[in-house]
Every structure is written in structure tokens, then in C-alpha cells.
Swiss-Prot record:
Source organism (scientific name): Shigella dysenteriae serotype 1 (strain Sd197)
Name assigned to this protein: Acetylglutamate kinase
Pfam families linked to this entry: AA_kinase
Cellular localization per UniProt: Cytoplasm
Record's signal peptide: none
Principal localisation: cytoplasm
Biological-process GO terms, alphabetical: arginine biosynthetic process via ornithine; L-arginine biosynthetic process
GO MF annotations, alphabetized: acetylglutamate kinase activity; ATP binding
Binding locations of ATP: D181, V182, S183, G184, I185, L186, I209, I210, T211
Gene Ontology terms: cellular component: cytoplasm
Pathway recorded for this protein: Amino-acid biosynthesis; L-arginine biosynthesis; N(2)-acetyl-L-ornithine from L-glutamate: step 2/4
Domain of life assignment: Bacteria
Length: 258
């Protein structure tokens, strides 16, 4: 089996029918013409935010990570492992793709521990066992994995989806693409930066050009590139016609170098 490709979905993608249609059409095209197995990893911040708003619950973030109190983890699990995951499975079904919905704890695919007590039920993801997902891939299934995990003590944890995707890529020896709303990392003039090193990223963070959630994304991509020992791409789902080329390893967004 070829080494898999993990496509991490983020941003408002889950909220946009047009975006999902583009993505799944590209996945169908890719799967028809390539043997390479694919895995989807997703968060669903927008789904969680909508639900929290509807329930009048505050959304609090610390350094770009969502604070998850004990009384909110069940709600967030329902939004990510439930609504967001099953929405993606429904789109796969609509496009005749045989998909299986999972969370990080299934088959112990990604090991999760509590990151920081101050953040509550927020997990740190580390590589686990490739056995379950490899079995699914060998049988032609598309695993769709939410970023909810569980500790050895049985505590549910909300994991940053970029970091979850990195841990799963390390588990499977997979390549990784982080798909988001933006076409990559932008410089101070709004122009896409084609390649990024750790030194360049540090410089742009110091200058205030890379901020907030993008800092988490860039650090996750740098961490992924270091962990995996190979480049990681940050790119946009908006240009559907470019997605098959992107899945084939053509740089379309910002390539994070080791």
C-alpha cells in the first residue's frame, strides 16, 4: 500500500455546501485516477461556535486553543464527533464514497493526554496504533476522523485538529495537507508565501504578521514537518480545480519545510 495522504479540513468548510461539493468532487476524481489511500481529519470550530451561541455558553480561547470546561466537553464532543463527522459522512455517501466515521480513540489510533489543567478538557495528541486505519484503507474505505480523543483514564478531550492530524500522520507514516480558508500563509502585503521555514515563521510572528489562530496553524505545520521529517502543505479548499494536483504533491499554498 502506498503511504497515505491525510487531508485536514478546517475553517468554514463544514459550513459551506459549495465548499463541500468542491472538495468531495475533487476527492472522487482523485480516487478514480490514483491508488493512494486518503484519510480525512476534521475539527469543526464553526459548528461548535454555533452550538455554543445557541445555548448561550461563552466561547473562551487561550493562545488560539479553545478552553473546554468539564460541563462543555459533552457538547463539543456531540458537535465534532457527531454533527461535523456525520455531515462529512453524508457528503461522502452522496458522492458514492465508502467512508467510515471515527474519533481519535478508535483502535487507539492517536493517544491523548490532558494538555493543561487551565484549558480543561483539551488534549495533547501523540502517535498511536496504525492497525485499525490501515485495515480500513486496505479495504478501500475513506476514514473520516474527528479531533475528539480519550485519555487512558477514559476522559474525553477536545484536541486541536491540526495537532490531531499531525499525530495521525506520524502514526500512519502519511503525508499531510492542512486545508483552510486561506490560500496559505500571507505576508504583510497579503501575498502568499510559497515556502516557510521555522526561522521565517518566528520572524513573521515577532513582526505581528502571523497572529492568533494562524500561529497555532503554522506551529502545528512546523511541528508536523519536524515530526514527519518531510514538508507539510497549508492550502485552500477554495480552488477545487487545483485540489487533485495538490493531493499529488504539487505545492499550491505554503509549503512548510523541515
Amino acid at each position: 500500500m502506498m503511504n497515505p495522504l491525510i487531508i485536514k479540513l478546517g475553517g468554514v468548510l463544514l459550513d459551506s455546501e459549495e465548499a463541500l461539493e468542491r472538495l468531495f468532487s475533487a476527492l472522487v476524481n482523485y480516487r478514480e485516477s490514483h491508488q493512494r489511500p486518503l484519510v480525512i481529519v476534521h475539527g469543526g470550530g464553526c459548528v461548535v461556535d454555533e452550538l455554543m451561541k445557541g445555548l448561550n455558553l461563552p466561547v473562551k480561547k487561550k493562545n488560539g486553543l479553545r478552553v473546554t470546561p468539564a460541563d462543555q466537553i459533552d457538547i463539543i464532543t456531540g458537535a465534532l464527533a457527531g454533527t461535523a463527522n456525520k455531515t462529512l459522512l453524508a457528503w461522502a455517501k452522496k458522492h458514492q464514497i465508502a467512508a467510515v466515521g471515527l474519533f481519535l480513540g478508535d483502535g487507539d489510533s492517536v493517544k491523548v493526554t490532558q494538555l493543561d489543567e487551565e484549558l480543561g478538557h483539551v488534549g495533547l495528541a501523540q502517535p498511536g496504533s496504525p492497525k485499525l486505519i490501515n485495515t480500513l484503507l486496505e479495504n478501500g474505505y475513506l476514514p473520516v476522523v474527528s479531533s475528539i480523543g480519550v485519555t487512558d483514564e477514559g476522559q474525553l478531550m477536545n484536541v486541536n485538529a491540526d495537532q490531531a492530524a499531525t499525530a495521525l500522520a506520524a502514526t500512519l507514516g502519511a503525508d499531510l495537507i492542512l486545508l483552510s480558508d486561506v490560500s496559505g500563509i500571507l505576508d504583510g502585503k497579503g501575498q502568499r508565501i510559497a515556502e516557510m521555514t521555522a526561522a521565517k515563521a518566528e520572524q513573521l510572528i515577532e513582526q505581528g504578521i502571523i497572529t492568533d489562530g494562524m500561529i497555532v496553524k503554522v506551529n502545528a505545520a512546523l511541528d508536523a514537518a519536524r515530526t514527519l521529517g518531510r514538508p507539510v502543505d497549508i492550502a485552500s479548499w477554495r480552488h477545487a480545480e487545483q485540489l487533485p494536483a495538490l493531493f499529488n504533491g504539487m505545492p499550491m499554498g505554503t509549503r512548510i519545510l523541515v
